[in-house]
Amino acid sequence: MKRWTLFLLLCVSCSCFAQENQSLDSLLCAIHDKDQSVRQRIQSVFLSGNRDSIMAASLQMNAVDQENQAVVFGILDKEGWPAGLCSLANSAIFLVIDHAALPAQEKYYPMVKEKADEGIIGKGDAATLQDRILMRKGEKQIYGTQTASVRKDDGTVYYLWPVENPDKLDELRKEVNLPPIADYIAIFKQQGMML
C-alpha cells in the first residue's frame, strides 16, 4: 500500500510539474512573440522616417519591454532559470534580458552565460549580450556583434562598435557559432544600412 501511495504521489507531482512547465512555456512564448513583433514594427516605422511614428513605436516598445521584464525577472529572481522549457521560451528569457537596461543585463549575464555553456541557448546569444554590456559601458566589444549610428545632415551613418582584437575577430566569432564579420556586415548592407 505504501508503494502505491508513493507511486500515486509521484505521478501527481510529475503531472503538476508538466502542466506548470507547459503554462510557463506558453507564457514565455507569448512574451517572445510580443518582443519580436514590436521590434519588427519599429523597424518598418523607422524606415519610413516619420519622427512621430518612430516616437510612438519607441514608446510602445518600451512599454512592452517593461511588461516583459516584470514577468521574466520575477521568474528569474524567484526560482532562477526554469528547467525543461522549450527553445522558444528559453529564447524569450534571453531576449528580455538582452533588451533590458544595463544593470539588469549585468545582473542576469551570469545566468545567460551558464545556459549558453549548457547548450540551452546559443553561445552567440551570450556573446551578443557580453558585447552589448561592454558597448554600453563605453568599452571595446569582443565579438563584433554591436553597431552604433550617428545622425548627419545627409542621413544616418552606421558603424561597427570598436573591437578589442580585430585580428582575431573571425576566430573569436567562430568559437561562439557566429558567422564571419564580413557576412555579418553584408546582412546590414542587404537591409540598406551601410557599415
Named regions from a protein language model:
Residues Q105-A182, A186-G192:
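Mature-region segments of soluble proteins
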Residues L9-S13, L27-I31, I181:
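Low-complexity, intrinsically disordered/propeptide-like segments
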Residues L9-L10, R41, F46, P180:
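Enrichment for repetitive, rod-forming helical segments
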Residues M1-S23:
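Bacterial Sec-dependent N-terminal signal peptides
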Residues E20-G144:
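N-terminal helix-rich structural modules
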